[in-house]
Amino acid sequence: MPQVAKYDTTGNRVGDIDLADNVFNEEVNEHVVHQVVTAQLATMRRGTASTKTRGEVSGGGRKPWRQKGTGRARHGSIRSPLWVGGGIVFGPRPRKHIKKVPKKVKKLALRSILSYKSQNEELIILDELKFDTPKTKQVVELLSNLNLEGKKVLIILPDKDANIYLSARNIPGVKTLVVDALNAFDLLNNDCIVMSEEAVKRVEEVLAR
């Protein structure tokens, strides 16, 4: 069972916390992580790219010139793919890029990423994270106390907290996420993850199933 330091919001170490082996100390499965992130990014695509075939391009209803006697190559329509402004052959069409991944595989990917973060000291645990009012200055001071200025930081919350969300949303590179919305891409796309002891317990409850 890995044991990591626990800090307060001023950056002082206030003790240690034991993390669950089956969530924060698993063998990192890079293949599964790649599979889940790729599927997630594919699902995020709009899939609206579209081109017109020769049957959809306007104009070109009649033969541009007679078949023989002009000295030019024979053509039957200006909508041919050979012409500038003609139809496109095998061009993109609107479609869904959704890739389905089993829930067990998604959870395995999340555990792998959290284990990687824990093993590489990219995970900071706070004894508590509460703000009475929404003020950006509070999060700026927190990041400064934890030596995280200028870094991409993901703050994981046990539940929705408007004060923390509003305090962090205007800071470049900082994102907040509740435990129920954890996903592989956001867990990977940062330099460090910050979460409270309460959030750790909530993560262990969700991912240990």
Swiss-Prot record:
SUPFAM superfamilies according to UniProt: Ribosomal protein L4
Location of region: Disordered: 46-76
CC annotations in GO: ribonucleoprotein complex; ribosome
Molecular function per GO: rRNA binding; structural constituent of ribosome
Record InterPro entries: Ribosomal_uL4 (IPR002136), Ribosomal_uL4-like (IPR013005), Ribosomal_uL4_dom_sf (IPR023574)
Entry keyword Lipoprotein: no
Top-level division of the source organism's lineage: Bacteria
Keyword NAD (UniProt): no
GO biological process, one term: translation
Keywords: Ribonucleoprotein, Ribosomal protein, RNA-binding, rRNA-binding
Pfam families tied to this protein: Ribosomal_L4
Bias-annotated ranges (Basic residues): 63-76
Protein function: One of the primary rRNA binding proteins, this protein initially binds near the 5'-end of the 23S rRNA. It is important during the early stages of 50S assembly. It makes multiple contacts with different domains of the 23S rRNA in the assembled 50S subunit and ribosome. Forms part of the polypeptide exit tunnel.
Family per similarity comment: Belongs to the universal ribosomal protein uL4 family.
NCBIfam families per record: rplD_bact
Quaternary organization: Part of the 50S ribosomal subunit.
Protein name per its UniProtKB record: Large ribosomal subunit protein uL4
Species annotation: Halothermothrix orenii (strain H 168 / OCM 544 / DSM 9562)
Gene name as annotated: rplD
